[in-house]
Amino acid sequence: MAELREVQITEEKPLLPGQTPEVAKTHSVETPYGSVTFTVYGTPKPKRPAILTYHDVGLNYKSCFQPLFQFADMQEIIQNFVRVHVDAPGMEEGAPVFPLGYQYPSLDQLADMIPCILQYLNFSTIIGIGVGAGAYVLSRYALTHPDTVEGLVLINIDPNAKGWMDWAAHKLTGLTSSISEMILGHLFSQEELSGNSELIQKYRNIIAHAPNLDNIELYWNSYNNRRDLNFVRGGDTTLKCPVMLVVGDQAPHEDAVVECNSKLDPTQTSFLKMADSGGQPQLTQPGKLTEAFKYFLQGMGYMASSCMTRLSRSRTASLTSAASIDGNRSRSRTLSQSSESGTLSSGPPGHTMEVSC
């Protein structure tokens, strides 16, 4: 497996006081389905997995994940893990447009590229963070390589193939809307699009004027042709690792994520529905997502000495108390966060805790 390119860059971003610029290395490797580009931050930590991210359609790793990984509270996490940001083929900055007739990889084939990345880096296990199409790719990878995935954070995942009604609606929309507008409707809620905030204007401009828009359309088509993941609770086709499902309240994929939650192992799955976050919680609510991710890592046995917010401390105390009563700490967790109410629900149906945050 040959390396095509390796360059060293310094991320351009506002720095926190006393923080030095992160050095990143961008690599490209050949796979059976073409070249894939990924960027590595940090150095491998002994006995710790890499954090590997995979972005959604219309985005690349920077536009999808930068606000989250640049968030102040996230710095404690990234100091403890090497991270690998994968760009889907043709989505990396400066990517040339694929020639006419190019056969873009399916989402299953994109998942099959990940072992080539890990082999090149000599990484054995990962914690995956995926959004939309990227969440599907990481889930497919976890199904075929369960021993290499320690945990998954899946934002806006839709594990189902498109049905006939979905296809009809998609084709009808395609007659009246541009590719960029259809992708925006996939990324953001109708309320957000109607409000036309600065965030929406920014991403509308990014997608509509992307020099690789033809490549983006190919990724979009692969997403719309995805196969059903066929998750079955209690069956062989399920995710074996701890999973945190995340979706914004009233987000385009809310129903799909709720359905996905119903199909996964309740002892391994947490469900976080975030209020006031829209379709892309990693962009609009990086603080809440960082806190949830930190707690997720602590549940996996990492960062036990990490500083915890009042919300996490209250939640830990409540769960410890509950565990001492029922003797079973492995159970489904549903987290519902609101900036107004600070309500946190956890555990079996009907078990609700009120905490301040």
UniProtKB/Swiss-Prot annotation:
It comes from the Eukaryota. Belongs to the NDRG family. It holds the Pfam family Ndr. Keywords: Acetylation, Cell projection, Cytoplasm, Developmental protein, Differentiation, Neurogenesis, Phosphoprotein, Tumor suppressor, Wnt signaling pathway. It comes from Bos taurus. This is Protein NDRG2. The keyword ATP-binding does not apply. The modification N-acetylalanine is found at A2. The lineage of its organism: Eukaryota, Metazoa, Chordata, Craniata, Vertebrata. Residues 333-347 have a biased composition (Low complexity). The modification Phosphothreonine is found at T20, T316, T320, T334, T343. SUPFAM superfamilies: alpha/beta-Hydrolases. The keyword Phosphoprotein applies. Residues 1-14 have a biased composition (Basic and acidic residues). It is found in: Cytoplasm; Cytoplasm, Perinuclear region; Cell projection, Growth cone. Contributes to the regulation of the Wnt signaling pathway. Down-regulates CTNNB1-mediated transcriptional activation of target genes, such as CCND1, and may thereby act as tumor suppressor. May be involved in dendritic cell and neuron differentiation. One of its GO terms (cellular component) is nucleus. Interacts with CTNNB1. The modification Phosphoserine is found at S312, S314, S318, S321, S324, S330, S336, S338, S339, S341, S356. One of its GO terms (biological process) is cell differentiation. Residues 1-26, 320-357 are annotated as: Disordered.
